[in-house]
Amino acid sequence: YPDNGQLPGLVTGAIARQGVYGGATTGEIRPVRIAAGGIGTDGPEDRGLSERCIIGFNAGPPFVPSLYNNNVQIFQSKDTAVLMTEMIHDARIVPLYESLDDLPPLNDDVRLWTGDSKGYWDQDTLVVVTRNFNGLSASFGQAGTSINKVLTERFTRVDEVTVDYEFTVEDPATFSDRFTGCLLYTSPSPRDLRK
């Protein structure tokens, strides 16, 4: 969704920053979202979030593959799931509940870089709903501020080595409509991981 396969348009006033891999950004807006480089050298706040190892350019959420380090590990215990990305070695610890209705809201004053994730099982699919982003990261790509973003991720095991990953981004302050993306994650062989 949407049916045309295109990202919805930005709403009036939504922030869209350029310069993902260096170069100019729009003004001197902080935090600097470019992956490498920055807008100055006076202090760490002038450098990009990826360069500072705060948020990787493909570490999500949502997980969107890019140049390298696209590995994601999923661990599960009785009460939690852990979604760990190789990029930045970020681990989201996701408490698990019985259903969507049981997900307790976090105080709206608490805002986190990767949001507050909570999950539940919908038959064979792990559903993770993330809210309370800090507004300093983008909603998707370089658009938006994430402050109003609600991200819903669905992880469905297809076979022994494949997970179907689907995500839906809802951010009415940035995009004119919600949108959904999906891709398959396959488990690399132990030999591939050693390379």
Where are these regions (language model features)?
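PEST-like low-complexity, intrinsically disordered acidic/proline/serine-rich tracts
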Residues: 1-187, 191
